[in-house]
Every structure is written in C-alpha cells, then in structure tokens.
C-alpha cells in the first residue's frame, strides 16, 4: 500500500495579548494625535509627547536622556512604551524590563542594570566585500629562486585569468591563495570566486560551456557569472554592545580534561568587568571614527520603576551621563511613596528628587466613559468576539466604576457563557451579569475581607 500523509503547516496561532491592538502612536503627519488610530483611544497629549520623543530618537538627539510616564493603573503607560518601539521599527534596539527583574543572587544589581543598558545600544557595522568572480581561462604559477638557497624553487605569485559575461581580467595573486586553489582542485574551465579582503577562494562548479565535453561526469555545471569580474558588495550587520560584551567575556575552553569537565557542568552567569567594557568601547569608538560602524542609541524601558532601590537610582544618575547611553523610558503608577532601600525618605513616584529633576515627565490621565466604551469595542473586535450594545454598555459601566482591566477581563468568560447558553448573536447583558457574579472585582473582594475578617488567617 502506498503511504500518503498530510503535511501540516507550521503557522502558529498568535495569542491575543494585552496590547495586541496597539500598532503605533496614531499620529497625523503634522504630529497631532488622531481621536482614534493605530489601536489608540484618548491620551492625545501623551501620544503627541511620545511622538516628539520618537522624532528626537530618530534624529539621534535624545541619547542619554530619560522620560517618565506617570499615571494611575490602566491608563496606558506600558502601551505608550510599546507604541514608541513600534514607531521606531525593528532596526532600533528596544529592551523592556520590569523594576524587580534586576535582583539576582548571582549578579549584583548595578551589573544587571548595566547589562540592560548595553542591550539597548546598537552598533550598525557596514562592511564592503570585494569579490572577483568568473570562469578560469588561465592558471599559471610563477616560480622564483628559493631565498633559503639550494636548488629548490618556490612559487612567487600566481597569474590567473577570469572571464565573466561582461569582460575578462588577469590577476596576480599571493602564493597563499595558490594553496587554497590547489585544495579546491581548480582547473581551467571552472567557475570560482575569490574574496579580496580575506583571500578566501571557493570553487562554484564547472562552466556550462564544457557540459558536452564528457558523457559520464559527476560534475555540477554552472553558467558564467553575469556582470563584471570585480564586484563590490556591502554587508550591514546589526549587533548590540551587550552581544560584543558576551562574545569577549566568555573564554573559549581548552582541550584538556578539566576544561571539558567545566564545560559539561552548569555554567555560572559571567559578570562582565568594567575594564572589558572600556576596551570594547575603545574598539567601537575606533570603528566609528573610521566610518566602519555607526552607533544606534535604542530605548531601555523600565516598567514599575518604583521597585528599584536607592543604589539603583544612584547608578542610573551616573549611567545617564556616560558617553554611550540609550534613551531611558521609566513608568510608575505610584504617587507620593517611600523610596525603596530607605527607611522614611518619601518622594513623588518613589523616585529620588535628584533623578526626578533630570526626567521629562509625560502624564497619563484616566479614560472617560466614552473612551472606555470605544476601547472595549476595539478589544472585542481584536479578540474576534461579538457583543450586543446593552452588554457593551454594561461592561463599559464596570470599566468606569471598577477598572478598565476588570472590564476587559470579563469579555472572554462572557463569550464562553454566551456559547454555552446557545446565543448565536454573541455576548448579551445576561452573560455579563452572570460573569460579574462568578468573578469578583478588587473592591467587592476587599469588602468581603473586611466584613468577614475573623474567618481569614491574618
């Protein structure tokens, strides 16, 4: 029996995340915010301010500065940072972290912070490769007297003729390339290419002009290359400074037993020294001076910045003043609170006043009932849910009275209840009411805890 099986596609279903609907900042060409665009509703002033920040980043005039997104929970601070990253595109590095991420048992706080700083700084390296490509028409090694004496002779250079569709060239090559040509077993009639910078030689195949020469031959025939024999290709590579740090910090293991055993054991996280970073900075600066590389300052986004302690804030002060630093976007939903790591020093947003004075602060404001309704309709469309107008009003009411997050979280359970209850028209008001009874919001839960406090442990 002939075996026939279906090949399944490897396309993945994208999960609808909290900010899937955000596609950009939703700005007009003149920089003013549209009422609703790119998944955004409201927050016009904050979006316009972020648009100015994006323009400064693109003009490379924002490096070493910091922005604070300040506002209550559910006002779109993380969404603004995500929109900034999408406006900048994939070529500009964007490194999002949470304030609590930098605490580790293996690596000190300031090291983890610096690591993320370096992740947010890109380096665009442009390399021009010169290549000679064509069919070999002549292969003549030139001999010379052996400089060590005796009767032996050495290869002084190699004369090679290359032919392409647009012309021919005769090259004088180094004897080291002759060895590479011998290894590749190149003969007249083969198509080869030689890299001028490295001297690497590669045999592509036999010219198709010789295809009828033999009846039986396990040879790959290729056409004569188009264009000139001498070609220039520009290769652009994007790396971050952290990639360079890691490449130089990890020592290559030897061949002895102890090195091999060390490689088998679980490796500890390497802490990159300040001296190594300074050496890499010197090399990077030299590349920039030569015009080989170009620095691309990216964005480091630190969410819940009030979770950093006083030592981290002090380090941030210094890091922002360094010659190579990215744009730092901070987000905090705290008002006047105690700075972490201190006993009783309180400040606005949980950030020390000296750092707060350096920040450009962008406020985010609570959404109006109409804006909440539009956001819920947009989320329902993104998640592929049908919702009736009375049900939408009910969910929007929860968004105004309780929180936008609670209202959005009711949508999916309500759609499941609507399907179970056999409602083809989508989510109805009864489904939202049933969901509301099944899942409590934070205020009702707190009221129950206060009412029945003796039934709980603490």
Curated annotation (Swiss-Prot):
Keyword Secreted on entry: no
UniProt EC number: 3.6.4.12
GO molecular function, one term: ATP binding
Entry coiled-coil feature ranges: none
Assigned GO CC terms: Ino80 complex; NuA4 histone acetyltransferase complex; R2TP complex; Swr1 complex
Residues that coordinate or bind ATP: 71-78
Principal location class: nucleus
UniProt-listed InterPro entries: AAA+_ATPase (IPR003593), P-loop_NTPase (IPR027417), RuvB-like (IPR027238), RuvB-like_C (IPR041048), RuvBL1/2_DNA/RNA_bd_dom (IPR042487), TIP49_P-loop (IPR010339)
Cellular compartment(s): Nucleus
Catalytic reaction list: ATP + H2O = ADP + phosphate + H(+)
Biological role stated in the UniProt entry: DNA helicase which participates in several chromatin remodeling complexes, including the SWR1 and the INO80 complexes. The SWR1 complex mediates the ATP-dependent exchange of histone H2A for the H2A variant HZT1 leading to transcriptional regulation of selected genes by chromatin remodeling. The INO80 complex remodels chromatin by shifting nucleosomes and is involved in DNA repair. Also involved in pre-rRNA processing.
Record note on quaternary structure: May form heterododecamers with RVB2. Component of the SWR1 chromatin remodeling complex, the INO80 chromatin remodeling complex, and of the R2TP complex.
Name assigned to this protein: RuvB-like helicase 1
Species: Emericella nidulans (strain FGSC A4 / ATCC 38163 / CBS 112.46 / NRRL 194 / M139) (Aspergillus nidulans)
Lineage per the UniProt record: Eukaryota, Fungi, Dikarya, Ascomycota, Pezizomycotina
